[in-house]
């Protein structure tokens, strides 16, 4: 069948997940005249990593994730990375609050719930680490109100399942901060996409697989699309393309032929949770309890026992158990990894394989892990867990970045990176962590990278500051403004907030 006629649009968003939905919402707020098309291979939005059960749903603010606070050689704790992640989540909170304020999202309870964030450790060395971590973090206003205890009875109050049945033979410790959240990113994505396509000039096309990206003379992009249901092909021309396709971003970036993408590769990691839906068990646990990963293990191995609230129902999640699959997407192909190999990224791929043997060994061990081994890991956080109450839940795929490096040949990075054209007409989001929680930060980074000329006082800047009042201000440095922002967004989002110290209240009010 001949290709359908070409279509013209200002913006094409590839992938209907939380990243594309967030960027699309930002762009339409800043420039209502923009025409935007979203292209998704599957038959609905949020079916890959954004799906409710394909991620842990943690509102990642680096409250409880100890891998963000490494110990320096001198024994002190470095909280710089944690602070950065912490205030990046504030950007998302402000963005969501803005959308609720203008009626784009009716009820925050449809996607976000207050759930305390906890860190839990056992053993003398780990207890000492958590004590030092708490001292460093609680001294900063971003972690004001964090609690710490080494009393098993207090921990049992905070997280009964964690302590019930635990022997008192070794020391334990925990921190808690009540401002933590559980976020249903699947529900949020549906809300954002629904809001976007309700506006003039915006549309989402499902069952639309992007098969080619061609740069035309004049700087526009021609996006070749195949309808997976009918087999028909068509093309769309756009001034700007964002590839927010999760694990599928790398193959699409390679299709673009951009020299800036040369040498990049991907390392796919699969994941499995244990899931409990028994209401009698779940009502005894209301927290996200993160443990400390074993020495030398990768970031995705951090164990946690989480409250999840999805569709109004409470569940428990434990994991993750990592594994290896050559798929780049949960609905992808086992050939994804092999088809991503190019002459330019062979050296980086081989270098990463050489330098990360421990990671490979860890993943192989996870793949070969028996059910009894998985339950033994659960037992460390829920000593009285009964295997019959738990079932396996397959998580989404994560594709970590492999990038070329002059000295080592290639580097494996556990983060995200924007890679795109030098004229800023196309950009792809590569990587995975910390993921959906920082979607607003990533969207703003795209704006700064690709639409810098519009971020002026006479163009988009006033509106951007209306959407994100802290834009241009460091919440890490400005304690009063940070407290003010958090109090405001907590009220709108209906989540818990720690009241600011009475002596400091006038200063915050004055800033407002």
Swiss-Prot record:
GO molecular function, one term: L-malate dehydrogenase (quinone) activity
Keywords from the named record: FAD, Flavoprotein, Oxidoreductase, Tricarboxylic acid cycle
Annotated Gene Ontology cellular component terms: cytoplasm
Residues in coiled coil: none
InterPro entries from the UniProt entry: FAD/NAD-bd_sf, MQO
The UniProt record lists the keyword Heme: no
Cofactor requirement: FAD
Pathway: Carbohydrate metabolism; tricarboxylic acid cycle; oxaloacetate from (S)-malate (quinone route): step 1/1
Reaction(s) catalysed by this chain's protein: (S)-malate + a quinone = a quinol + oxaloacetate
GO biological process terms on file: tricarboxylic acid cycle
EC number: 1.1.5.4
Family of the protein in this entry: Belongs to the MQO family.
HAMAP family tied to this protein: MQO (MF_00212)
Protein's name according to its UniProt entry: Probable malate:quinone oxidoreductase
Lineage, top ranks: Bacteria, Pseudomonadati, Pseudomonadota, Alphaproteobacteria, Hyphomicrobiales
């Amino acid at each position: 069948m001949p290709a359908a006629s070409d279509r013209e649009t200002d913006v094409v968003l590839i992938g209907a997940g939380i990243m594309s939905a967030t960027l699309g919402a930002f762009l339409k707020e800043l420039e209502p005249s923009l025409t935007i098309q979203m292209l998704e291979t599957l038959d609905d939005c949020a079916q890959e990593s954004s799906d409710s059960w394909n991620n842990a749903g943690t509102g990642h603010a680096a409250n409880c994730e100890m891998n963000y606070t490494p110990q320096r050689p001198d024994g002190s704790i470095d909280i710089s990375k944690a602070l950065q992640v912490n205030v990046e989540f504030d950007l998302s909170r402000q963005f969501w609050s803005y959308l609720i304020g203008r009626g784009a999202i009716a009820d925050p309870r449809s996607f976000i719930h207050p759930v305390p964030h906890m860190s839990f450790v056992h053993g003398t060395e780990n207890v000492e680490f958590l004590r030092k971590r708490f001292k460093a973090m609680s001294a900063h206003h971003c972690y004001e109100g964090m609690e710490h205890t080494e009393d098993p009875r207090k921990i049992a109050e905070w997280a009964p399942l964690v302590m019930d049945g635990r022997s008192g033979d070794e020391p334990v410790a925990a921190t808690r901060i009540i401002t933590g959240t559980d976020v249903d990113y699947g529900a949020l994505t549906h809300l954002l996409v629904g809001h976007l396509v309700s506006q003039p000039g915006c549309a989402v096309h499902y069952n639309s697989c992007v098969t080619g990206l061609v740069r035309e003379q004049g700087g526009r992009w021609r996006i070749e699309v195949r309808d997976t249901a009918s087999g028909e092909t068509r093309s769309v021309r756009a001034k700007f393309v964002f590839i927010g396709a999760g694990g599928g971003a790398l193959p699409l970036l390679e299709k673009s032929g951009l020299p800036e993408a040369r040498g990049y590769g991907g390392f796919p990691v699969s994941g499995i949770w244990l899931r409990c839906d028994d209401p009698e068990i779940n009502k005894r646990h209301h927290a996200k309890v993160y443990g400390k990963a074993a020495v030398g293990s990768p970031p995705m191995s951090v164990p946690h026992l989480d409250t999840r609230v999805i569709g109004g129902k409470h569940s428990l999640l434990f994991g993750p158990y990592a594994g290896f699959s050559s798929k780049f997407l949960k609905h992808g192909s086992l050939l994804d990894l092999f088809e991503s190999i190019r002459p330019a990224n062979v050296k980086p791929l081989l270098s990463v394989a050489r330098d990360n043997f421990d990671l490979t060994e860890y993943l192989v061990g996870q793949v070969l892990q028996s059910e009894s081994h998985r339950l033994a890991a659960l037992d460390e956080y829920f000593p009285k867990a009964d295997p019959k109450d738990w079932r396996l839940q397959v998580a989404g795929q994560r594709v970590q970045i492999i990038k070329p490096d002059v000295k080592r040949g290639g580097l494996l990075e556990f983060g995200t990176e924007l890679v795109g054209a030098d004229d800023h007409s196309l950009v792809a989001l590569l990587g995975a962590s910390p993921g959906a929680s920082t979607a607003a930060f990533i969207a703003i980074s795209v704006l700064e990278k690709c639409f810098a000329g519009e971020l002026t006082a006479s163009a988009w800047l006033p509106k951007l500051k209306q959407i994100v009042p802290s834009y241009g201000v460091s919440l890490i440095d400005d304690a009063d403004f940070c407290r003010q922002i958090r109090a405001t967004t907590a009220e709108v989002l209906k989540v818990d907030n720690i009241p600011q110290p009475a002596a400091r209240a006038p200063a915050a009010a004055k800033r407002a």
